[in-house]
Amino acid sequence: MHLPSLSLSLTALAIASPSAAYPHFGSSQPVLHSSSDTTQSRADAIKAAFSHAWDGYLQYAFPHDELHPVSNGYGDSRNGWGASAVDALSTAVIMRNATIVNQILDHVGKIDYSKTNTTVSLFETTIRYLGGMLSGYDLLKGPVSDLVQNSSKIDVLLTQSKNLADVLKFAFDTPSGVPYNNLNITSGGNDGAKTNGLAVTGTLALEWTRLSDLTGDTTYADLSQKAESYLLNPQPKSAEPFPGLVGSNINISNGQFTDAQVSWNGGDDSYYEYLIKMYVYDPKRFGLYKDRWVAAAQSTMQHLASHPSSRPDLTFLASYNNGTLGLSSQHLTCFDGGSFLLGGTVLNRTDFINFGLDLVSGCHDTYNSTLTGIGPESFSWDTSDIPSSQQSLYEKAGFYITSGAYILRPEVIESFYYAWRVTGQETYRDWIWSAFSAVNDYCRTSSGFSGLTDVNAANGGSRYDNQESFLFAEVMKYSYMAFAEDAAWQVQPGSGNQFVFNTEAHPVRVSST
């Protein structure tokens, strides 16, 4: 999950015709659409795309946070610590690319997390940096222990994880224990916010608990779980309009909710995601988290499931506020099918699995209905506000586009991956391949992958000159794993998962293994 703002200025937008500036699949690019492709050749093509993005980042942007893949410049939106490198680590490990893994490990050992000139997001830093390092540690100390010969390089991952958490933990020093998100780590200050968001507060427990379990220092788990406690027992009771579904903002001073706006959209999403994932991580300690997820899932099926009038066969999730349903959704929200599938298979609930597959199909429709084969940043099925130019799209597809951007988000491919792993049905791998191929077609540049301004323009519109680090962590990983061999980190049907993925797709070893 990532906050819904695109965070893209006009200066980051390169106005260029992709057909002219970036011919699709020149002589150096793999052809991805051959009907004779085997599972192995698809896996190899995805690995090649990952290496293409890494090579461009290494040449033009490393050790900065991200590549600007149109201008071949760089950005430091994540504090200048090398976000793309740390986010790429677990994917490079899973792909068994020892060269890239060692390059990243060498970099991690040099990071000084106590120094930055920009505001630090507790949430983003936790899911990208802390999650990335802990995942690399768990993989390289566990099922991929043969990849790196120098064990001290691996040990640095845990040392640096602790160093980072020690820099960040003052965020929780509030009257309630609900943390500030936007931090000045130099002064020990914050932005003075009165509230924190549901997802920002509720997407910390997995990484901080894992750090405690690995180090034996319970401080980190205690801090994150204290913050979570207010979400698990929401006050006032009016903040929970349906069982398990809670408001969007929490007062930092007293831990009380300040609203009862309910959704699975950006800003709320990964709170629900982590409820069931904490149970997968340790069912003995986190039974309450599971109970709250089950309540939320049942309420979602009953109260938020929505079917467009033009396509009643489709299922999307509405939002809810004071008796009114909001008939709009986001690319970010499309993780929801994967969450229902994970919960359904772990808890042996076929109703959750079937509903999850319905959500996956709805999100597939947002990809399958555009000219690029990539889904939009946001969309709606509210018939009171359909633009005349999109009436035909709504009649055919069941939605219309409210923001046509694509910034390399992973959530649709992520849910396709869960559908494949839970059902074993080849359809979902085909959907992953189609989505990955579309990204490779329309987003690929000479040095990496760029975002698009309009997924329903024949050429994807213009280019956003930014390559988010989650391209490495999520899009490439979920795509690759669908065509890779079974392994300890892969999602398993039933309750046999040895790893669980954080919201940035970094797999951490579950507590009991």
Swiss-Prot record:
Ca(2+) binds at T503. Disulfide bonds join C334-C363. Its main location: cytoplasm. Glycans are attached at N97, N117, N150, N184, N251, N322, N348, N368. GO terms for molecular function: calcium ion binding; mannosyl-oligosaccharide 1,2-alpha-mannosidase activity. Monomer. This is Mannosyl-oligosaccharide alpha-1,2-mannosidase 1B. It comes from Aspergillus phoenicis.
